[in-house]
Each structure stands twice: as structure tokens, then as C-alpha cells.
Amino acid sequence: MNRFPDNARVVFIGDSITAANLTLPYIIHTYKTQKIASGIRFFNCGVAGGTAEFARISYDTDIARHKPTHAVVSFGINDSHRDLLANPRSKERQDALYAAYENYKANMTALVDRLHADGISVTLCTPAPYDEYTESKTPALHGGFALMQGYAEFVRTLAKEKGTELCDIHAKVSYLLETDPLISDDHIHPTNHGYFTLARIILAEQGIDIGEEMPIPDYFSRWHSYVAPLRCVLASECMIVRDFNAPTEQKMKMMSTRVENQDWIQPVFERFIRTYVEYKPQEAELYRMIDLTYEEDIF
């Protein structure tokens, strides 16, 4: 995996693991403090609940706007429809899992093709493993680890077919899990230590030593205060609105009605819906402030 050059514009495209914005700051900080490249810009294009399909749908709005030269792409856990594993084995379950996998392959291939057509250098990351075997308070889905192994293997194949660079997150994290608790009780999302480790893995692939583990530096706080609500708006589009190209007025009316009726669909969505109603009208300003605070505070 080559280092990003001077003046590169690097988008990190992925799901909630990317959107959490707990790995990218370490990569930016390392590039900055070790003076690896000048004039470089990094952009968080992660979406909680995101899939390769949603990345294609939101591409022009959320990815192409940054005029990227490089893209680091990681999807799989949401594309897999892993919750089907909670159902008893049946032909219907098998068919649904297979359909999800075929859909993932088609959308990942199309996403890479679009990035290449736009002249963007692509690094594909295999999805992080589903941590099926570490004991936790939350019961694991039987077969989750094997499911994500299949998705990781496809990404390895796709990288070879398309001539992209590859960062094999799945293999490296799977190995480390034997002795290092990197993933939280939900078996999917990293711990804070896990997010740092992801940055270490990516940078190590570029021949860069991140150094000792540390908290995210304070100078990222203002930038993150704009990244977080914007990523939440996109997550709401993906998981709740589910009609990205509908008129904004229609989407705002639907989400405002949910707030008025306290209709959250499920409790975890309350924060997303409230954030959407507050910040969707400010979406363009959030993008502007992300760029401004990056320039003023970070790089």
C-alpha cells in the first residue's frame, strides 16, 4: 500500500467503523507530525449502517464533491444482512444470505469502477471480522465469523481483478483477536484501542510507524464537532429515510413528524432522527465548516 503523496485528497468510504471518526484522526495526526506529505486533505465519508450500495447512491453528494485523488474503501458487515443468522437454518435463510452476498459483489464492483472512472486511486480494505468467539454480554450470531470471511475473500479477489491496493484488515484483526480484545461487546465495533489499532494497521501497510498509543489530540475537536452531525445526517438517510433522492422537504416532513410523535422506530434511532431534523437544513454549511476547521486547526 503506497503512501499518500503531497496534495492528495483522500476519502475514507465505509460504514459506522469509518463514520465514528476514531481511526482517521490518528492517520491524519501521523501524516502531520511525521511530515509524510504536504498539502494533503483527508475526508470522512463513512456512514453508520452504510453499504456499498448506499455509497453508490450518495456518491455525487458525499464523495465526488471532495474531488478525491485517493479512496480507501471498506464495506461488508451491513451488506451481509448478518441478522439473518439469528433465524433457524432454512432454504429461505440461505437464499437471502446468498442474495445479499451477490448484491454486495455487484455494488462493490460498480463502486470501484466508478472510482476508477473518476481517476481515483483505490485501496480496498477487507471488512473487520465478526468477533464470534470472544465472550461478551451480548450473545454472538453463530456463523458470523465465517460469514465475514467470505466477504473478505471477495474483496481480496476484487482487488486483484481491478488492480487496486489492498489492506487486509480482516486477516490482521483476526490474528490479533487471539490475544488482544479489539472489538466491543456487540462483536462488530472496535473498542477505542481497536480504532487505534486499525490506524496502526493501515499506516503499517504504508511503511509508517504510528508510535505509542495515545488519545486523539484535542486539536481535532472542532473539526469533529462538524463531522459527527453530518455523518449522522447521512446515516439517517441510509437507515431511516431510505429514499436518498426524494425531495428534501418531503424527507424533513417525514422526520419532523417522527420527532413530534416520538416515533423512533427503535430506541437507537432517536438520536439519528433528532440530529437529522436539526442539521439536515444546515448540510451545506456542515461541509463548509468541515473544510474550514481542517484548514485552520489540523493541516
Show which residues each predicted segment covers.
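The substrate-binding groove and active-site-proximal loops of carbohydrate-active enzymes
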Residues: 48, 92-103, 139-146, 189
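Flexible glycine/proline-enriched surface loops and loop-helix/loop-strand junctions
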Residues: 138-141, 179-187
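Charged, glycine-enriched surface loops/patches
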Residues: 90-125, 154, 158, 162-164
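Solvent-exposed loop/turn segments at secondary-structure junctions
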Residues: 16-19, 48-52, 77-82, 128-132, ...
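Active-site segments of SGNH/GDSL-like serine hydrolases
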Residues: 74, 78, 87, 111-146
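Serine-esterase "nucleophile elbow" of acetyl-processing enzymes
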Residues: 1-48, 53, 58-71, 198, ...
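Conserved catalytic region of serine esterases and O-acyltransferases that act on ester linkages
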Residues: 6, 161, 182-299
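Substrate-gating cap/lid alpha-helix
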Residues: 132-169
